[in-house]
Amino acid sequence: MPKYRSATTTHGRNMAGARALWRATGMTDDDFGKPIIAVVNSFTQFVPGHVHLRDLGKLVAEQIEASGGVAKEFNTIAVDDGIAMGHGGMLYSLPSRELIADSVEYMVNAHCADAMVCISNCDKITPGMLMASLRLNIPVIFVSGGPMEAGKTKLSDQIIKLDLVDAMIQGADPKVSDAQSDQVERSACPTCGSCSGMFTANSMNCLTEALGLSQPGNGSLLATHADREQLFLSAGTRIVELTKRYYEQDDASALPRNIANKAAFENAMTLDIAMGGSTNTVLHLLAAAQEAEIDFTMSDIDKLSRKVPQLCKVAPSTPKYHMEDVHRAGGVLGILGELDRAGLLNREVKNILGLTLPQSLEQYDIMLTKDDAVKSMFRAGPAGIRTTKAFSQNCRWDTLDDDRAEGCIRSLEHAYSQEGGLAVLYGNFAENGCIVKTAGVDDSILKFTGPAKVYESQDDAVEAILGGKVVAGDVVVIRYEGPKGGPGMQEMLYPTTFLKSMGLGKACALITDGRFSGGTSGLSIGHVSPEAASGGNIAIIEDGDLIEIDIPNRGIQLQLSDQEIAARREAQDARGDKAWTPKDRQREVSYALRAYATLATSADKGAVRDKSKLGG
C-alpha cells in the first residue's frame, strides 16, 4: 500500500519542527494524516486568461477541505504571449514552460504534497503544469480558466466575430482607417479567458481533456459562464477521491501516467489533427510524453496526420467559429464522438472520473446523451458583456449545434477535409521534420515553389515585409530562431500577420526553425529540425535558392544537389567558433536565456532539455 508522501513531514517525533510550521499555516491535530493537496494556481493580472483566477484557488481549496483533505495553494508564473509578441519579451515565453514545470516540482516535492489540482489556462502554463504532473506522477486534476468570449463589432453594416489576430491584422494594414483599427482593437478581446479561437491555450486545454486529466467540458466552456464554477467545485471533491483511491486503496489507475498513457496521447493528437489545433501543441505533447517516459515521437504524429480527417474548423482558420461555437456543438467530446464513430480512437483509455472512452461518450457526447443537464451545459453561451469576472453570466443558446453536415463539428462523411488540420513535412533541410497547420492553408497553395528570402531574425523579416521587399511568390526563411538559436523559439505571429496585411497571405510561404502562435494561418511552416543553431541545413539556405513545398506528399525540399549542400556545410564549419550562428545579428541575451539555450534540444524533441548533458 502506498504511503502518503505528506507523512514524511507530519508523522514522528523528529518532525516536530515541520509540524510546528504546518500549525502556523492553520493546520491542527485533526489535519495530520489527511492528504495534503497542492492547489497550483496561476493567477496574474498580466494575462486575461488568468486575471480571473485569484479567487478560484480558494474555491477549490474549500472543496478539498470539505471532502477530507488539506489544501495548500501556491502560484506559478504566467507569460502572455500576445503581450510579449513582437519584441524581446517573446524570447522568454517557451523557456517559461520549463520554469513552470520545475517550480511545480520544487514546491510539491519540497513539501511532500500528495496530489495536485492544476489551475491553468494559457499557452505555456498548461503545458508546464502537464509536464510537471507527468514527471511527479501523483494524482492530479486540471481545471482551466476557460476560453474568452469572441469579440463582436459592426463593420459595413454587418456584425462580425473578432479575436486578437484580427486586431493585429487591422492595425498593420495601411488600407484600414485609424477609426476602424481602433474599433476592432476595442472589440477583439471583450472578457477574461484564453483568446477565443483555436489558438495554443484552448488547443492545450482541449488536449488535456482528451488525455483524460480534466473533466468533460473543461476545454470549451466559457470563462464567464456560471456553469464553469461546477468544474472547480467538483475538481476539489474529485481530487480527494482520486488521492484516496491511490494511497488508501492501492489503485495505481488513479495516477496520471496510467491515465495519460500512450493510447491517450495518440487520442489527444488525433483530436488535435481533427480540430486543426495550434502547431505548438505538437511541441508540448512531445515534451509531455518525454516526462511520462512514453515513446511518442514525430513519426507517430506523421502517421496519424495521414489518416485523420479535419472535422472542426475554428478561428484563425475561419472567422465563422470560435470556442463558444465549439462548445455549443459538443466540445471535445463532440469531436471525439465523431472520431470514435470513424474508428480512429483507442477506446480502452480512461479519464480521471474512471470512465472509459465509450462510457464518457455515452454520457457526454451530445449526439448520444439522454442527460438534459449535459445538454444544458453545452448550451452555455456568451453574454457579450465586457468583464474580467469568472462565472458572471448564465446565457444559453436556444439550441445545440448538432448539425454534423454543415455545423461547427462535422462527421467523417461531411469532413472539412479528409486530410487533417496538421501535417509533418520532411526534406533535405528538415531531416527530422517540420510542422504546418494545414487547416489554415488555402487549397491553392498546398503545393508551392519559390525563391528564398533569408533573414537571420524575426525583426529583419518584419522590416522587409512591411518595407515591400517581400513580393508574391517568395518563400520567407527566418532562421536562428529555434530553442537554442533564439534562444527561446519565438512565435512568428507578426511576420505571418503582416504578410496578410500586405496582401500576401495566399501568395507567399514562411519557413522557420522558430514556431508560430496558435493564431497563425497561411502557408506557415515551423519547427524545422534540426534548427540552424544545431547544424541544420536551414542555416545554409541563401537568397534566391528555390524551395519546393508539397503538403499533399508531405515534402519540403531545397533544390540543391547533395554536392552543393555538402560544400555549403563545409563553408559553414570553416567559420570556426562562428559556425552555425547568425551573421551580424544584434541581440542581447540574458544569462537566464543562455542557460536555457545550453540545454535546449530542437523542436522535434519537444524543445526539452538535453538530459545527456545532465548525466541523465
Curated annotation (Swiss-Prot):
Obligatory cofactor(s): [2Fe-2S] cluster; Mg(2+)
Pathway: Amino-acid biosynthesis; L-isoleucine biosynthesis; L-isoleucine from 2-oxobutanoate: step 3/4; Amino-acid biosynthesis; L-valine biosynthesis; L-valine from pyruvate: step 3/4
Stretch forming the signal peptide: none
InterPro entries: Dihydro-acid_dehy_C (IPR042096), DihydroxyA_deHydtase (IPR004404), DiOHA_6PGluconate_deHydtase_CS (IPR020558), ILV_EDD_C (IPR056740), ILV_EDD_N (IPR000581), IlvD/EDD_N (IPR037237)
UniProt key word Iron: yes
GO biological process: isoleucine biosynthetic process; L-valine biosynthetic process
Binding site for [2Fe-2S] cluster: C122, C195
A matching Pfam family: ILV_EDD_C
Residues bearing the modification N6-carboxylysine: K124
GO terms under cellular component: cytosol
Gene3D superfamilies: IlvD/EDD C-terminal domain-like (3.50.30.80)
Assigned EC number: 4.2.1.9
Cofactor binding annotation: Binds 1 [2Fe-2S] cluster per subunit. This cluster acts as a Lewis acid cofactor.
Enzyme class (EC, first level): lyase
Assembly with partners or alone: Homodimer.
Function: Functions in the biosynthesis of branched-chain amino acids. Catalyzes the dehydration of (2R,3R)-2,3-dihydroxy-3-methylpentanoate (2,3-dihydroxy-3-methylvalerate) into 2-oxo-3-methylpentanoate (2-oxo-3-methylvalerate) and of (2R)-2,3-dihydroxy-3-methylbutanoate (2,3-dihydroxyisovalerate) into 2-oxo-3-methylbutanoate (2-oxoisovalerate), the penultimate precursor to L-isoleucine and L-valine, respectively.
Protein name, entry field: Dihydroxy-acid dehydratase
Organism (species): Enterobacter sp. (strain 638)
Lineage: Bacteria, Pseudomonadati, Pseudomonadota, Gammaproteobacteria, Enterobacterales
